[in-house]
From Swiss-Prot:
Keyword entries, A-Z: DNA-directed RNA polymerase, Metal-binding, Nucleotidyltransferase, Transcription, Transferase, Zinc
GO BP: DNA-templated transcription
Known partners and oligomeric status: In cyanobacteria the RNAP catalytic core is composed of 2 alpha, 1 beta, 1 beta', 1 gamma and 1 omega subunit. When a sigma factor is associated with the core the holoenzyme is formed, which can initiate transcription.
Low complexity composition-biased segments: 1354-1366
Feature: compositional bias, Polar residues: 1295-1305
Cofactor(s) needed for function: Zn(2+)
Gene field: rpoC2
GO molecular function (one): DNA-directed RNA polymerase activity
GO-annotated cellular components: DNA-directed RNA polymerase complex
Name of the protein this chain belongs to: DNA-directed RNA polymerase subunit beta'
TM segment ranges: none
Entry's EC annotation: 2.7.7.6
Skewed-composition ranges (Basic residues): 1-20
Listed NCBIfam families: PRK02597.1, rpoC2_cyan
Organism: Prochlorococcus marinus (strain MIT 9301)
Amino acid sequence: MTSSKPKKTSRVRKTTKNSKKNNPLTMPALAKTPPSFKNKVVDKKALKNLVSWAYKTHGTAVTAAMADNLKDLGFKYATQAAVSISVDDLKVPEAKQDLIGQAEEQISATEECYRLGEITEVERHTKVIDTWTETNERLVDAVKNNFNQNDPLNSVWMMANSGARGNMSQVRQLVGMRGLMANPQGEIIDLPIRTNFREGLTVTEYVISSYGARKGLVDTALRTADSGYLTRRLVDVAQDVIVREEDCGTERSIVVEAEDGKFGARLLGRLTAEDIFDAEENLVVPQNTAIDPALSGEIEKASINKVKIRSPLTCEANRSVCRRCYGWALAHNHLVDLGEAVGIIAAQSIGEPGTQLTMRTFHTGGVSTAESGVVRSKITGKVEFSSKAKVRGYRTPHGVEAKQAEVDFILKIVPQGSNSGKPQKIEVSSGSLLFVEDGEEINSDITVAQIIAGTVKKSVEKATKDVICDLAGQVRYDKVIQPKEVTDRQGNITLKAQRLGRLWVLAGDVYNLPPNARPVISSGKSVDEGTVLAEASQSSEFGGQVRLRESVGDSREVQIVTTSMSLTNFKLIEESTHSGQIYNLESSDGISYRLNISPGSKISNGEVIADLTDERFRTKTGGLVKYAPGLSVKKARSSKNGFEVSQGGTLLWIPQETHEINKDISLLMIEDMKWIEAGTEVVKDIFSQTSGIVTVTQKNDILREITVRNGTFHECDDEEVLNRFTEEGNLVNPGEKILDGVDNKEILFVQKLETPKCRGLLLRTVEEFTIPDQAELPQLSHVKQEKGPHLGLKAIQRLTYKDGELIKSVEGVELLRTHLSIESFDATPQMTIDVESIEDKNDASINRLNLVILESILVRRDTLSDSSHGSTHTELQVKNDQLVKAGDVIATTQILCKEKGFVQLPNVVEDEPIRRLIVEREEDKIKIKISDKAVVKIGDRVVDGDPISKSVKSTSCGEIEEISNSSVTLRLGRPYMVSPDSVLHVKDGDLVLRGDGLALLVFERQKTGDIVQGLPRIEELLEARRPRDSAILSKKSGIVQIKKGNDEESVSLSVIEKDDFVNEYQLLIGKNIMVSDGQQVTGGESLTDGPINPHELLDCYFNDLKDQKPLIEAARESISKLQRSMVSEVQNVYKSQGVAIDDKHIEVIVRQMTSKVRIEDAGDTTLLPGELIELRQVEDTNQAMAITGGAPAEFTPVLLGITKASLNTDSFISAASFQETTRVLTEAAIEGKSDWLRGLKENVIIGRLIPAGTGFSGFVEELSSEAGPHPDILAEESGGYRRAQNLRPDYTVDMPQSPSVSSTAILDDPSDEDLETTRNRHGIDPSSSNFAAFARPNAENQFSEDQLPDPAALEGLQEEGLLSDE
């Protein structure tokens, strides 16, 4: 057995940290001793250990039998016990009422703090939620104790406790309280569900709790997809990591540090990288030994804190991992086998919990964001900080002022005076919160500190909350807020608070003024009820004649006629038809216009009011329209109304009759292309109106159309003549020759026709319509006046059809229409034109059409309308039919004061009208009697409990208005705390009404704890996303220097580096500095808070190290630092969800993400700047450069996210099958890439055996057999795996056991012909080639290794094109 496999005897069952069983280290390890479980409760965990022990010591068969026996035992007693669950088993603990009572007291205290403006709305919310969360936790403990002491055999308790069904959080909901719920946006509702399912939920609680349940189901569905995609990307990035070597021989390793002296499972299955000695220099574990639980225990016992182990991160095997760096395969706890696809196992191990985690969202329904690590004082005494302590002020999320530790130190509570004893020591880590001062004396059981364990980064998100005003009044800022104007990218200016401070609203009665009102009273005047505060007037814009209309609703309309136009030479004639009234306009010369609108309606500018009914332009049938030259229309077509004529001329009309028919062809009564007379029946019940040649259009034996074209038909066979005309038709002017014997005196339309009998020309007559330039209309009037709009009528001729249009119709159509349209000038859009019918002044029997332009003014009636307007009083200033000039006042409105008080106007910005004013009433003030001198000044703002004089405290919040000897007057107000960076919606001095938004608080909150937050976080880490608002990192190591600016807010932070170079960092407002003045920092350390950008971190590490070490070392070390932090970040997310994943899986993935470097300067190598290439290849290239004396390549390490890494893999087949197939394939084609088929995916895709598992041995042995006595050509992939593509993977070769060199000992020895064909296929000249595999091996041709640079290495570089042939 190899040394790496532990002996059977040492393999005792794995104990978990908190298992109470005998520790195998305190008990001599006997091979066959089962874990003791005498007189113990065997729960799920103990069963696990028992089965695991049986499996490890006795193998599968025995374990299976034992498990069967356990099952029988279990079923037997479960049957006899008949445990069932009933309502009576759900026992609610007595303590519940007290706990809820305490929580409610705490919460009402918090609400009071909020009312006094001591904490912000956000802090109140957080505090309420945390109070409930804590109550919930305490209630769970109460439930546990209740069952444990009073009813240990309760069915519910037994089920949950044994792990058979259910868990504590579900029992909590049954008998404790359901707890806090989240709303659909994921925000926690601050009303918890206080009842449990045993007591029953109220309707409100039921609705709230059903939110969570539905959300859980939906989330599960969505997350399963997310998690599956994550697994796919992971598999793709790691699929070609296979264990290909026994030992890579690396000297590098990673260090694992103990947590609290314990390693837990973190060393299990790893190989030591060097001998481990204890304090007395005794060897505990030799190098290259696999650490099993027993050894891990011994290391802990020898109190060794750091162990160097081998890891896939540091493995130097090319494109794979070697057995020793990987350690145990976790499936069977032995060293991993060659050919194991560890990449895929790693990918599945990380991806699979993602699915589970998603599934595990909604069982509890509740959501918690509890605070942890609170330390209370155990004794009464005095607080002492140690000498190196550094603290700074900090405000907790609950609005408590506390101190935050900047460095780690020890805090002591020293007993004072008589009660001596041991002092209590508390270790405070950097970033922890302290609630006591140095030197303060405290009692026992006081919260002293909240210790932050390590750097647990919960993911935070920025959130906002509105502060809504509860009372009307005037806004006042505290000085400390220091509002600052911030302009965003869109140029919007917002006010932001820079510091924590209060925003006050001082009470008063706020009046909204109507749009055009102006105050008529000055600020500071006292007013009584009924005093006029402001006046608004409404005036006419153009002037004219007033018409008062009846009032509608709460306002009445005043119309002012600015322009009117009466059509005196038209009579308005009304006709009644069955479809309603029709109005015609008749002019004195008898032309009649049809009116499109009825009197009493409104029309707008440019609208057509009447059409001329003109019979001259009406045809008898359908036909074809042609414009003769000279006739032109305006381009723009308003399709409804046709084309406006711009110049008159002649319109040509070729009549033809079209019957649209959709009937069966059997009904046709005539023949196609035949001449028919007018009145012929063409189809049953359809008669032709004209004579002419008939054309029938049919489709699938259905008649579509029948066309009758009039004219005369002339037979003609002369090609020359026929070619002059088309089937569509040509116009022929009078006197032009058409055919011999045809004399044309007028315009004809000629078409070429082929009838069944012969060919010929159809000559059709053309009708001419003359269109005038201007419509002939009776005189029309234009009305003008000094100011305001004019009115006019305009006639427009419009052609209905465009040039060349065919109108399919039997009835006649109208070719030209004449419209009358309204023209008004300078009309404003809100002015409409009204159409009225009036009697003629001279003859009452005749009605005339009257057009008027009205200006309409709505005047409000006096109402006690909404309270904020105050009571208004409106007066009309005009009478009916009065003539008013432009600008005359029509009505005035006064706003009256409702109660006695003092007026204040807001601050006026120039040109802006005042829209609100405030009256400070008696009820907005309060007098406080004092007996001694006041300790406050006028203008001070106080809250409940602040001292007014030595003996009197304030009873309300507000601002001091006046102070006399015996009393102080306070104007009531309400403070609102505003946190830094909040957006202020109001300015100092603004007037607000109740319900207005005052500010938008910006705060960070922890996202609700759930793997939901876990999955995106894992994705963010593995995709190496750049976080927003990331922390500022120190670029190089040095000493921090913090300078305060002129105002206390601005701080400049710089780091003095080694060569006294000062590097200054720009700080954004709202960033907390995480370092203190004079502190030593290393490159890559966070200077401010925020998420860390991994790319930036790598750069900082690398730049810091490359000044101190050679490039390759700096790259290696910076990469390994980054790898360590990535592994621990990923682990943190999974640990916080209670999922255990072995480090080595994450290491395999992280290794794939960090294997590449980017070439910055190629030196003398054949690499390209910007190329991504493996660090190992660059290293080899640079070594070769060192031999030949060329300039080496310079590079920086890069971090690729898993998607990027998958697309940048060497195998283009694998990359193309993952994403962006066309791009990957075209690039590969352009670069002329080869795919060496190293991974699993490539081989699967082209249908070969995969090079892992059983396929691996064949792969390796074939290669060794081909390599013959030169196994070194397998070392570098150029010789070895490149040949793999030519091998048939389906046969294997047995190697002889003795390492023999003679050529006869090789079994599958290629014949000379084989060698020859292989050489030819590869174009190899045996004389110049040093390819051992192609030459006949014999015993003499072996060099001693040290004579040459390693030929395999150089050869490989040439092959890869990284080294030129010199």
